[in-house]
Structure formats: structure tokens, C-alpha cells
């Protein structure tokens, strides 16, 4: 139950709901059969005959690129440090927590599938579950001038496109 995080559990039966999984199910429709991005990854893997080895290699390469970008400071201007206070003290979050420092192809190859029993998508080669935030301010030119805001872009046009939710990994 939602209140468990604040009040703890009481005696008796309780039902735990995975809010992330429930969110996917709600967003895609209760009867869609799609309840997680990992399931759609398995669909894409089957459709395009992508091997487990290719998935692991792509994941490894992505981790190495992210690690190199972090180490070289390329993300530093894009991340605003946030102080997180807890009973144990304060922690400054200023680095993407998703890339794993000790990722190897060997370790990736030992992970078991997590979305389908006979699948190939693992916790190591699936899209990560990351905490994060982003925002942008879109306004009129006259408002930006009035408020002395730096104009960094001009919205000329936009399009909306989508793919079959069962294959969301195909999104371009």
C-alpha cells in the first residue's frame, strides 16, 4: 500500500503494487498485453533477429561511451547538482547514476533474462530505469525580451509521430 512508506505495515494481509509496472500497464491500456519496456524490447529482438551477444555488445559499448563522457566532463554543464538530505547526512547528486563502473562483456553475458523466461533481454542490456529531470522554457519572443531572457532556439515547426506500442524500440 502507498501509505506503507510512511506508516509501515500493519498486521494482516497486504497487497504490494509495483508502481512502475502499474504505470506502464495503465499508460498502454489494461488489456494491451504490454506492461513494460522490456517486453517491447523482446518483441523488437524477435522481429529483427537480434542476438543476445549483439545486445550485450551494444549495451557494453553504450556504457563505455557514457563512462568516457562522464570522466571527460562532457555532461558537467548539463547536470545541476542536487543535495539529497537523509538521516545519514547529505549527498550531492551530480553524476548520472546509470552507467556501471565495472561493466564487462563477461558480466553482461552471465545475466539471466528478466522479461521472458526464454528471452534475451536482461537487466544489463535493457534500457535503464533512471531518475532524472529535464525542463525547457518555451515562450514568445516578446515575452523573452520583456523578461530579458536569453533566446537559445527558435521553434519553427514540429511533428508528432508514433509507432506500435508493442515495438516502441523502433521509435525514430
Model-predicted regions and their roles:
Residues 1-5, 94, 166-168:
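Short acidic, glycine/serine/threonine-rich loops at helix termini
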Residues 1-44:
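Flexible glycine-/small-residue-enriched beta->alpha junction loops
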Residues 17, 53-146, 151, 156:
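N-terminal extracellular/periplasmic Venus flytrap/periplasmic-binding protein-like
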Residues 22-24, 48, 158-162:
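A short, mixed-charge helix-start or loop-turn motif at secondary-structure junctions
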Residues 24-25, 46, 118-123:
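Flexible glycine/proline-enriched surface loops and loop-helix/loop-strand junctions
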Residues 33-37, 130-133, 172:
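Catalytic-loop motifs flanking and including active-site residues across diverse enzymes
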Residues 35-59:
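Conserved thiamine diphosphate
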Residues 39-42, 78, 86, 156-172:
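Active-site pocket-lining segment
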Amino acid at each position: 500500500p502507498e501509505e506503507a512508506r510512511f506508516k509501515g505495515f500493519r498486521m494482516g494481509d497486504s497487497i504490494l503494487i509495483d508502481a512502475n509496472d502499474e504505470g506502464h500497464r495503465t499508460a498502454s491500456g489494461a488489456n494491451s498485453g504490454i506492461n513494460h519496456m522490456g517486453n517491447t524490447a523482446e518483441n523488437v529482438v524477435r522481429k529483427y533477429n537480434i542476438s543476445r551477444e549483439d545486445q550485450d555488445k551494444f549495451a557494453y559499448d553504450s556504457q563505455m561511451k557514457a563512462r568516457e563522457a562522464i570522466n571527460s566532463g562532457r555532461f558537467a554543464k548539463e547536470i545541476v547538482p542536487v543535495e539529497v538530505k537523509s538521516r545519514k547526512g547529505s549527498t550531492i547528486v551530480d553524476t548520472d547514476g546509470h552507467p556501471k563502473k565495472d561493466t564487462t562483456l563477461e558480466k553482461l553475458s552471465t545475466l539471466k533474462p528478466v522479461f521472458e523466461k526464454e528471452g534475451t533481454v536482461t537487466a544489463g542490456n535493457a534500457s535503464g530505469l533512471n531518475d532524472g529531470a529535464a525542463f525547457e522554457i518555451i515562450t514568445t519572443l516578446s515575452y523573452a525580451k520583456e523578461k530579458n531572457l536569453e533566446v537559445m532556439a527558435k521553434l519553427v515547426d514540429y511533428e508528432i509521430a508514433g509507432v506500435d506500442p508493442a515495438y516502441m524500440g523502433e521509435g525514430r
